[in-house]
Amino acid sequence: MASDLAMSAELPNSPLAIEYVNDFDLMKFEVKKEPPEAERFCHRLPPGSLSSTPISTPCSSVPSSPSFCAPSPGAQSGVNPSNPNAANKPQLEDLYWMSNYQHHINPEALNLTPEDAVEALIGNPHHHHHHHQGYDGFRGQQYPGDEMAPSGHHHQVHHHHHHHNHHLRLEDRFSDEQLVSMSVRELNRQLRGFSKEEVIRLKQKRRTLKNRGYAQSCRYKRVQQRHILETEKCQLQSQVEQLKQEVSRLAKERDLYKDKYEKLASRSFTTRESPPQGNPGKANADFFM
C-alpha cells in the first residue's frame, strides 16, 4: 500500500499519462531472471537513459522500449534512506516514459486524423534532429573504424586541392605581358623559393609566349608590307594608265600637226612652179598702146 501511495505521489498529473499507465496489466507478465551479463550491460547505461536499444529511426517512427533492468545493489546502497521515493523515481520514469514521446502515440487514441498526425510530425523538426544526432553518435561508437576512411580521404583531397592551388597561384602570379616583358634576371629573382619543376614550367611558358609573340610580329610585318606593296602597285598601275592616255593624246596631236604641215608644204610648192596669169595681159596692153 505504501508503494502504491508512493507511485501515486510520483505520477504526473497528466490524465493521458495516468490513463496509459492504467491500461497496463502487469500481473500477466512472468518474472524472468536476467543473466549476469545482461544485468551488467543494463547497469552500464547512463542513469538518465530510457532505453537499452538504439533510438528508433525516422522511418520506423517507433519509440524505444523502456528498460526494466533491476537496479544493482550498489546503486541502492547509495540511496538516502530518509527519501525512499528517490529510489522508485527511475522506475516510475520508465513507466510513464511515453509522456515524453507524445508525437509517437497512436492518433486514434487521441481522436486525431492521419492528417493531424502528419502535421504534428512536421511541426517538430527539432526533436527529430536530436534523434538523428543520437543515432549518429551510436553508430560512431559501434563502428569507430568507419570514421577513419572519410577523414583520410578528406585529408588526401585537401592535400591535392592545396597542391593544385599552389600550382595555380604560381602560374597566375604573372600575366602573359609580364612574362614577355620581364627580363631573365628579374624573373629569376621572382622565382626564388619555388620548386625546380615549377620554375622550368614557367620558363617554358615564357619561351612559348615569346616565340608566339615573335611569330605574330613577323606575320604582322609581312602582312603590313604586303599591303604597302599592293597599294604602291595600284598607284603605279594607275600612273601607267594615265601615261598611256597621255601618250595616245600626244600621238593624235602629232598626227594632226603632221597633216597640216604636209598640206602647207604642198601648197607652197605649187605656187612656186606656176607663174601668175595677170602679168602677160598687162604687158600686151602696154605693148599695143
Swiss-Prot record:
Polar residues: compositionally biased ranges: 74-87, 267-276
Region annotation Basic motif: where it falls in the sequence: 201-226
Residues annotated as signal peptide: none
The keyword Iron is annotated on this UniProt entry: no
UniProt region (Disordered), positions on chain: 52-87, 126-164, 266-289
Biased segments, Basic residues type: 152-164
Pfam family, one: bZIP_Maf
Chain segments carrying region Leucine-zipper: 229-250
Gene Ontology cellular-component annotations: nucleus
Keywords: Developmental protein, DNA-binding, Nucleus, Transcription, Transcription regulation
UniProt keyword Cell wall biogenesis/degradation present: no
Disulfide bond entries: none
Biased composition (Low complexity): 52-73
Chief site of localization: nucleus
Similarity field: Belongs to the bZIP family. Maf subfamily.
PANTHER family tied to this protein: TRANSCRIPTION FACTOR MAF, TRANSCRIPTION FACTOR MAFA
Functional note: Transcription factor, possibly involved in transcription regulation during lens development.
Protein name as it appears in the record: Transcription factor MafA
Gene: mafa
